[in-house]
Amino acid sequence: LINATYVSDVEPGEMVIVGPEGITREHYTTPGVTAHCSFEHVYFSRPDSIVFGKPVAESREQMGRLLAREHPVEADVVVPVPDSGVSAAIGYAAESGIPYRQALIRNHYVGRTFIEPSQAIRDFGVKLKLNPVRHLLEGKRVVLVDDSIVRGTTSRKIVRMVRNAGAREVHLRISCPPTISPCYYGVDTPSQNELIAANNSLEQIREFVEADSLAYLSHDALRDSIKDTNGQFCYACYTGKYPTLVQIGEIVLAKTGCC
């Protein structure tokens, strides 16, 4: 929109000064250990973004390709959960040779459901947000590609939606590892007891979401997809290992308003 040319990101603690003499860059803090949010490439960022110097669509497509290598399945169509599952589904389809079909149509006037405050609003949001294309699903073995599973309730409703539209089988593929820990760095994720992967086995999650099979991308494949060769990303939501000391008790008190 502004007809700009991408040069680089503004680094943490850096100040970019644009003046008559040109552009100068200064660091006003001591450089520390970098811990970029890996979930930006999985879910948050638009696919046409360049985040931490890496194209998001390219990262997500590679996640899908590696997901197909790690967890192949015999199927008739690959269907994304739009929008954040689209690039990964394209990669999965390209790697597996299974045709890609846009069989879930998204209403773009509905926001992201996993951060809504109540389950009732999240459930209603799924109905408003997605509509299946029956003739693309009926009688088909479907690989359903999504970016993540948080509570599992949204995934279950989408699996049911695809099955009710006539799908013969629904195989759920997730383009990141299981989310087992909350984020304490500004993302309003649920508490750990609400995260389905923190409290259930893979088979229990599969049964809950009512899929014929379920598989997640591995940690190594995620790192490869976002080209994290120097350990500069945060994976705390998948590992529980935070890059800084986290006072969990104080955060819980602050969120609940207790003293």
What does each of the following model-derived ranges do?
Residues 1-259:
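PRPP-associated nucleotide enzymes
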